[in-house]
Structure formats: C-alpha cells, structure tokens
C-alpha cells in the first residue's frame, strides 16, 4: 500500500471502518484494529478491492497478528430507530470501546468521527490509504458476509448469501413477493414500500 498519508503523533493507533450502510437487511458491522509494527501484514487494501479468498486469508492473518482488534454492530431495529448514519457512528463507538488495550488515536474511514473519549481523525478513502483502516475494513466485511450467509439459511428465498442484503434486482423482486423479514430495515424506502404493498 502506497500513500502520502501522514500519521498523527501517537504511540498506539487504531483504524476503524464499517460495512453494511447500504443494504436493506442485516446489521451494520464495524471493526477496530491496532496493528503490530513488529509483525507487519503484507497485502492490506480496501476490502472491496480484494477477492473473497484474499480477504479470508488476510482476515486470519489480521486476527492472529494484530495487537488488538474488536467488532461493533448496530442491528436493523437500531438502524430503524436512530437512522443509518447515527447507527453507524454507534457501531464505531462500540468497536473502539471493545478494544482490549489502550489506543492514543483513532483513524476512521469517511468524513465524520463518532464521539470518543480519545482523539480521532476522519480519513476520506482511508481504507485505501491507511493499513489500520484497511485491516478494519477486512474484518468488518468478512464478519458481516458470514452473518448474511447464515441468515440465508434462516430466511431462504431472499438470496442473502449472494447479495448480502444489498438492493439487487433479485432481492427487490423477492422482497415484493415474500415481504420483509425481521432483519429488514423498515426505515429504508424499498422495504417500506414492500410492506405497504403487502398489507394494503
């Protein structure tokens, strides 16, 4: 990974990223990672640019080599209650608070930082610039993808294992035909529209 990003002065830095803001179903999942400079991981990149095989290999390496890592989440009902923006910030807070060791600075992918008790910075496209954020993006994506594949077995017919809850044509078709599950986000327009259509 090559980048002109300049790190803040800090002894311990955590990277944070999220996966799952756009889907119509399932949680938004976040991860926080503190890498070990003495035990580097080669090949870190934005999780969306990696093959599933490469993501899985890096997931195993990150969870074994990182000084600390943790996950956060906000469920569909929380997303409906406080909206996806605030739910994402809440999930990021949860991930940072769950880290087992102290960090001096948090680098967060995107434009806005959640309220934290430690200094933080938002980095636009941070998942392609900052290894710690890249690692967090990989952990969050692998975790959420696995959950959606498991959800596919609980609610067969929606294709969760394939589209992971995103609004593909197939998902929208099945949503209109079968109606929303308990994991669908009712505050999202396509889900609300399907619900109204089925209930009259």
From Swiss-Prot:
**Does Metal-binding show up as a keyword for this record?**
yes
Q: Where does a divalent metal cation bind?
A: 17-18, 109
Co-factor: note = Manganese or magnesium. Binds 1 divalent metal ion per monomer in the absence of substrate. May bind a second metal ion after substrate binding.
MF terms in GO: manganese ion binding; RNA binding; RNA-DNA hybrid ribonuclease activity
Where does the protein principally reside?
Answer: cytoplasm
Which SUPFAM superfamilies does the annotation name? Answer: Ribonuclease H-like
**Annotated Gene Ontology cellular component terms:** cytoplasm; ribonuclease H2 complex
Query: What Pfam families does this protein's entry cite?
Result: RNase_HII
Segment forming the signal sequence = none
Q: Where in the cell is it found?
A: Cytoplasm
Recorded superkingdom: Bacteria
Q: For this protein, what is the EC number?
A: 3.1.26.4
Q: Where is the RNase H type-2 domain?
A: 11-200
Which reactions are catalysed by this chain?
Endonucleolytic cleavage to 5'-phosphomonoester
Please name the GO terms of the biological process aspect recorded for this protein, alphabetically.
Answer: DNA replication, removal of RNA primer; mismatch repair
Q: What does the sequence similarity comment in the record state about its family?
A: Belongs to the RNase HII family.
Under NCBIfam families, the record lists: PRK00015.1-1, PRK00015.1-3, PRK00015.1-4
- Protein name listed in UniProt: Ribonuclease HII
What is the scientific name of the source organism? Answer: Hamiltonella defensa subsp. Acyrthosiphon pisum (strain 5AT)
Gene (UniProt): rnhB
């Amino acid at each position: 990974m090559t980048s002109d990003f300049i790190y803040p002065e800090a002894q311990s830095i955590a990277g944070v990223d999220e996966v799952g803001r756009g889907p119509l179903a399932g949680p938004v999942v976040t991860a926080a990672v503190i890498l070990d400079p003495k035990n580097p991981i080669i090949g870190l990149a934005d999780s969306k640019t990696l093959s599933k095989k490469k993501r899985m290999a890096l997931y195993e390496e990150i969870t074994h080599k990182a000084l600390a890592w943790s996950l956060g989440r906000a469920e569909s009902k929380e997303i409906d209650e406080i909206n996806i923006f605030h739910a994402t910030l809440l999930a990021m807070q949860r991930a940072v608070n769950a880290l087992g060791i102290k960090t001096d600075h948090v680098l967060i992918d995107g434009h806005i930082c959640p309220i934290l008790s430690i200094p933080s910075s938002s980095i636009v496209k941070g998942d392609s610039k900052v290894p710690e954020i890249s690692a967090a993006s990989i952990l969050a994506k692998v975790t959420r993808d696995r959950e959606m594949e498991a959800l596919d077995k609980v609610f067969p017919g929606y294709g969760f294992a394939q589209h992971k809850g995103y609004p593909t044509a197939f998902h929208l078709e099945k949503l209109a035909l079968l109606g929303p599950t308990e994991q669908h986000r009712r505050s999202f327009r396509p889900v609300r529209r399907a619900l109204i259509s089925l209930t009259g």
